[in-house]
Amino acid sequence: MQEQYRPEEIEADVQLHWQEKQTFKVTEQLGKEKYYCLSMLPYPSGRLHMGHVRNYTIGDVISRYQRMLGKNVLQPIGWDAFGLPAEGAAVKNNTAPAPWTYANIDYMKNQLKLLGFGYDWDREIATCKPDYYRWEQWFFTKLYEKGLVYKKTSAVNWCPNDQTVLANEQVIDGCCWRCDTKVERKEIPQWFIKITAYADQLLNDLDTLESWPEQVKTMQRNWIGRSEGVEITFDVADSEEKLSVYTTRPDTFMGVTYVAVAAGHPLAAQAAVTNPALADFIAECRNTKVAEADMATMEKKGMATGLYAIHPLNGEKVAIWVANFVLMEYGTGAVMAVPGHDQRDWEFATKYDLSIKPVILNADGSEPDLSAQAMTEKGSLFNSGEFDGLDFEAGFNAIADKLVEKGIGERKVNYRLRDWGVSRQRYWGAPIPMMTLEDGTVIPTPEDQLPVILPEDVVMDGITSPLKSNPEWAKTTVNGQPALRETDTFDTFMESSWYYARYTCPQYDQGMLDPAAANYWLPVDQYVGGIEHAIMHLMYFRFFHKLMRDAGLVTSDEPAKRLLCQGMVLADAFYYLGNNGERIWVSPTDVTVERDEKGRIVKATDNEGRDVVYAGMSKMSKSKNNGIDPQIMVEKYGADTVRLFMMFASPAEMTLEWQESGVEGANRFLKRVWRQAFEHTGKGAVTALDITTLTEDQKSLRRDLHKTIAKVTDDIGRRQTFNTAIAAIMELMNKLAKAPQESDQDRALTQETLLAVVRMLYPFTPHVCFTLWQALQGEGDVDTAPWPVADENAMVEDSKLVVVQVNGKVRGKITVAADASEEQVRERAAQEPLVAKYLDGVTVRKVIYVPGKLLNLVVG
């Protein structure tokens, strides 16, 4: 081997070897235990970022480790290739989304290969290819036939100038991102999949996901939002109309002081006929952004309708208001308001000077003070007539029973979860396989006409989807009858909801999945991805698996056994103020910093000598210009160094702070390992290790080696604390560096240690380990080498170091035989001069002995 560690030379050679040998290509082997490790597939944005590198390095470490355990390991990769960014980029670059996307895929694929990830490239998929989305279209038609797909009108963001639908991210301060026109809410027909039909399964099966983060499961439980409550019907005063609301707090029912309805509610429309101001307010509500997050944070506004509902238990009139925070598509489109015991209702009532009536006592039995906020805790009822004195549960049931008995209430289980709207009024997505006949009948596209292919040779104007602007595309025939194709495309979450299953049989053309392959590999054993996908992608991912199970395509209930959510990658961010006071962000690679004695940045200047403000560490992003290009780091330090830093700098699920000094440290460690191997191999052949003739020092080093193997095995396999595994290997290498190399046995022990270290480092730094394994004359390639096994006998200690205390203060440390009795330890302790000094002339009243660790003598 050469003397210097030169990653730029060895990494390309090793990657070529893997490619030629098809090292990571796998097939189903029924007699072999399988392991399916999957990282969330990337969107082909053009370049990898450090978040990608972290995600895929974690997956690769786990995959390589499992291969070394002798398992048949599948680790595939592909491209989540549809989506809105491609449309914007196509307009900007005067091209079409398809060529832009395919060019990005080619570039990013090369980047992934440079990082040495062990993918089975024969299984690569791109979700924008017809051979992929045809089966998604086929499956959608089957769901339609089962009654799990339906069409209904739903609100979207509409730009009246461009006559187009806008995604939430295209609405900026209530205006169209392109033409700055005020955006409206518009109801248009859209396709939905009945995820609510699976709400109970999705909720209950969370309990079976023992190896998923509790945080993700909690977020999904909250998103599904199962609640038990009562649907209550109010009469409307001086009218035949009825008004229904749903509540999970019937115990507060006697505190209702008003009812709020959505702008789209029939009562709102009825009242607006004779109230122009109300009609204007309803129109304003229609211009509210559709996203639920926006609804939660926007200013709450309302207007009285002049109508009143009759409280069904006390006969009082309560005003009916239109409120912008009530949505028609949620529940009944109306809510009962109890401002005494709901904070949103309290804020609204305070703003509009509406009555606030307390009906729940504080825990100490006192009446609540509602002057500053609502009292939202549960407690005993008062101000509630016949229900006074009841606690929450008794009050809930008594009022619910009374409402049911009067025929104006019905106990119901409700869900916060809403059916999945899969229609997108965009071009760059999979066409929805539905069509409309001349008589208006809507039918699924016949199987022999699938896939409905998205035309790729299009001109983007940045406004209208080419599918909608070209009326010829929609024209087709069914059984000789003219028909029009659906011009909406699927939500891109559709593609990412089942890709993991298609990886098991990407070339299969007889159906959506090859049952034999799918049921060999599934479920995924380890899934890796960001916590930001907890409720959207990971919910649809679980839902689709259950749909495929019920269609007979898979046999398991859940798609992934174990989930690891890696933390974000942070980097320093710097800016200066522009002429208009705006922040202009400067890349950290263009900034020179000065630090104080504690390493804190105290001064920063950019390449032009301009003082810049240090804004702290934040997530790497384009907006703050603080992303670090992985390719530059690989060219500078090598892929192995970047991978090692990524796994060592922080626990996998925590945020990682990018520090180039840390990258340099990882590089120095690999150089040190290389140098130790170079010096060792330079001394010629090694004799066999004879463990029966080892000296105490040699036994100690070998004990440390096998303890390290045991720890690293547990850290990678069970605990997934990869950073502590690397730290243990580093500590072992420090001990090896201090060990003598004179005798044959010294060198034989060094050989055993280095061969084990190379295998333990291999999942993290595969290129350098491949090369070192050959230099150390390991058997075969390290790619097929078994994981090292800790020798239990080697870990047994002949002696123990025991701390001796007198009255709780340390007075000495003694070495005793590992199997020494308490009596023998006491005798040995008494021989220590300092211990003997404190025992002279006193009586030992009590002895506390922790075997092999501590002896405390209590004297008086």
Curated annotation (Swiss-Prot):
<dbReference type="InterPro" id="IPR015413">
    <property type="entry name" value="Methionyl/Leucyl_tRNA_Synth"/>
</dbReference>
<keyword id="KW-0030">Aminoacyl-tRNA synthetase</keyword>
<feature type="short sequence motif" description="'HIGH' region">
    <location>
        <begin position="42"/>
        <end position="52"/>
    </location>
</feature>
<feature type="binding site">
    <location>
        <position position="622"/>
    </location>
    <ligand>
        <name>ATP</name>
    </ligand>
</feature>
<dbReference type="GO" id="GO:0002161">
    <property type="term" value="F:aminoacyl-tRNA deacylase activity"/>
</dbReference>
<keyword id="KW-0648">Protein biosynthesis</keyword>
<keyword id="KW-0547">Nucleotide-binding</keyword>
<keyword id="KW-0436">Ligase</keyword>
<dbReference type="InterPro" id="IPR009080">
    <property type="entry name" value="tRNAsynth_Ia_anticodon-bd"/>
</dbReference>
<comment type="similarity">
    <text>Belongs to the class-I aminoacyl-tRNA synthetase family.</text>
</comment>
<dbReference type="Pfam" id="PF00133">
    <property type="entry name" value="tRNA-synt_1"/>
</dbReference>
<dbReference type="InterPro" id="IPR002300">
    <property type="entry name" value="aa-tRNA-synth_Ia"/>
</dbReference>
<protein>
    <recommendedName>
        <fullName>Leucine--tRNA ligase</fullName>
        <ecNumber>6.1.1.4</ecNumber>
    </recommendedName>
</protein>
<dbReference type="InterPro" id="IPR002302">
    <property type="entry name" value="Leu-tRNA-ligase"/>
</dbReference>
<dbReference type="GO" id="GO:0005829">
    <property type="term" value="C:cytosol"/>
</dbReference>
<dbReference type="GO" id="GO:0005524">
    <property type="term" value="F:ATP binding"/>
</dbReference>
<dbReference type="Pfam" id="PF09334">
    <property type="entry name" value="tRNA-synt_1g"/>
</dbReference>
<dbReference type="GO" id="GO:0006429">
    <property type="term" value="P:leucyl-tRNA aminoacylation"/>
</dbReference>
<dbReference type="InterPro" id="IPR013155">
    <property type="entry name" value="M/V/L/I-tRNA-synth_anticd-bd"/>
</dbReference>
<dbReference type="InterPro" id="IPR014729">
    <property type="entry name" value="Rossmann-like_a/b/a_fold"/>
</dbReference>
<dbReference type="GO" id="GO:0004823">
    <property type="term" value="F:leucine-tRNA ligase activity"/>
</dbReference>
<dbReference type="Pfam" id="PF08264">
    <property type="entry name" value="Anticodon_1"/>
</dbReference>
<dbReference type="Pfam" id="PF13603">
    <property type="entry name" value="tRNA-synt_1_2"/>
</dbReference>
<dbReference type="InterPro" id="IPR009008">
    <property type="entry name" value="Val/Leu/Ile-tRNA-synth_edit"/>
</dbReference>
<dbReference type="InterPro" id="IPR025709">
    <property type="entry name" value="Leu_tRNA-synth_edit"/>
</dbReference>
<keyword id="KW-0963">Cytoplasm</keyword>
<keyword id="KW-0067">ATP-binding</keyword>
<dbReference type="InterPro" id="IPR001412">
    <property type="entry name" value="aa-tRNA-synth_I_CS"/>
</dbReference>
<feature type="short sequence motif" description="'KMSKS' region">
    <location>
        <begin position="619"/>
        <end position="623"/>
    </location>
</feature>
